Amino acid sequence: DVENEMHPEWPIPLPGVMSAILVSMDDKYLYLNNWLHGDMRQYDITDPHKPVLTGQVFLGGLLGKAPKVNGVEVAGGPQMFQLSLDGKRLYVTTSLFSTWDNQFYPEIREKGGVMIQIDCDPVNGGMKVNPNFMVNFGQEPNGPSRCHEARYPGGDCTSDIWL
């Protein structure tokens, strides 16, 4: 369960909004995004009846818990994501749907979206933002632009192009 959290600008507790989930190729980990809160989570689902939170990082979001990445304050929250076939790299984008982006994250109009790499430990669990990787779509020549979904050349955990 993702608990609602209090927010000073909301009259009700801020709900968690998950728009995607992904299971690693070895069926050990489940990943989910929490678009409004701003976090990505990794759960060990070896026992699917008792998932264990093994990793959590914040990227943007409305709770103000996210650090800057490469000196950039992330606009939006974690939305679509792709996991490498070896389970070591999770690529996360920050635009859900432009109408919703504009409502909840109006700063994304000027800043644009980003794609961030999260380094994952596929053996012991755990996640950390890679401080050396960011694609800043706000700096595009005709931008600022937003990024919704990325595909991994050669295959990822949610497509069958690697077969």
Model-assigned labels for residue ranges:
Residues Q42-T54, Y105-E107, Q117-V129:
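Short loop/turn segments immediately following beta-strands, especially the blade-tip
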Residues G38-M40, T99-W100, M115:
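Structural signal for beta-propeller blades
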Residues V2-M25, E73-L83:
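Beta-rich, blade/repeat-based domains predominating
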Residues D1-P13, T54-E73, N130-L163:
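Surface-exposed loop and turn segments in beta-propeller and other repeat-based domains
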Residues W35, S95:
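Short loop/turn segments immediately following the C-termini of beta-strands
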Residues D26-K28, D86-K88:
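Short coil/turn segments that connect the beta-strands within blades of beta-propeller domains
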